[in-house]
A protein has these predicted regions:
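A short glycine-rich, His/Asp/Glu-containing loop-to-beta-strand
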Residues: 11-47
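Short strand-coil-strand connectors
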Residues: 26, 66-70, 93
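Surface-exposed loop/turn positions
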Residues: 28, 41, 78, 86, ...
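Short, conserved beta-strand element in jelly-roll/cupin
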Residues: 49-65
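Short acidic-glycine-tyrosine-enriched beta hairpin
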Residues: 69-84
C-alpha cells in the first residue's frame, strides 16, 4: 500500500544547513530547500559537483549560475536545472531568495556539505 502521509513544514521552524539553506518538505525521492535573503557576494564561489539533480525557482533578487562553461542569469520568475554531477557555481548579484528541489534529497547522507 502506498504511503499517503501528508507532511506540512513551516519554513520558520525548518532546520538550517551548513550553507544557510532551510530544509523544507522531504520525501524518499525528492526534497525542497529555501535560500532566503542570501546576500550579494564578492564574486563567483568555487565550483562544485553534486550527486543529485537540482531544479530551482527565483522568488526575488538576481544571481548568475555558472554551469559547465555556460553563464545563466537568474531573475525573479526564472527557473533552472543543474544536472547531477555537473560542475557549477553561483554568484549572488542582488539579495537572493529561491526555492530548490533536489533528487535524491540533498540533505541525506551528507550530500549537501559545503
Amino acid at each position: 500500500m502506498a504511503d499517503t502521509t501528508v507532511t506540512k513544514v513551516n519554513s520558520r521552524h525548518s532546520p538550517r544547513g551548513a550553507m544557510g539553506q532551510r530544509y523544507l518538505a522531504s520525501g524518499k525521492s525528492v526534497a525542497m530547500r529555501l535560500w532566503e535573503a542570501e546576500e550579494a557576494d564578492s564574486g563567483e564561489k568555487s565550483a562544485s559537483r553534486r550527486d543529485y539533480e537540482t531544479v530551482g525557482y527565483v522568488i526575488e533578487g538576481r544571481a548568475v549560475l555558472h554551469l559547465e562553461g555556460q553563464t545563466v542569469r537568474l531573475e525573479p520568475g526564472d527557473s533552472w536545472v543543474v544536472p547531477k554531477g555537473a560542475e557549477h557555481s553561483y554568484e549572488i548579484v542582488e539579495t537572493f531568495t529561491a526555492v530548490e528541489a533536489t533528487s535524491p534529497p540533498a540533505h541525506a547522507h551528507g550530500r549537501d556539505e559545503p
